[in-house]
């Protein structure tokens, strides 16, 4: 398969002819769990204010995208049913989700994909746009995802 590593910050790419806005970063709710076991944790896992401003500038300049890829999702799409019950949401830094909500507002896009919550789910919208949450066990066919209709489900777009 063709694998392309994205830059560590907001950027614009073209994948298979689709103008794509990449917005990495998320807060790790399991940070202390990971650190206590000697597992990897990245201190710069969330975008800095400077990187967020870069994303805002890209949005202002480009305004229209076929696809948006982010690690987490805009705040209005947070799957509350997937929140870990033993972690108080009051302790979770929501800056990235709030930032992505700000970016989504007024942004013209057809599809948005993210993976932070480790589940597979489609969020169909009345305006024809789709929000897709994926975990690393699923591979989506980009062409099928970009051309799906209101009658297609997750199984219809898997590679």
Regions found by a protein language model. Give the residues of each.
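A conserved beta-strand/loop element that lines the FAD pocket in flavoprotein oxidoreductases
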Residues: 3-7, 133-134
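Short amphipathic alpha-helical segments and helix-helix/interface helices
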Residues: 10, 55-59, 96-104
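Binuclear metal-dependent phosphoesterase catalytic core
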Residues: 11-16, 91, 101-106, 117-159
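Histidine-centered divalent metal-coordination motifs
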Residues: 71, 113-120
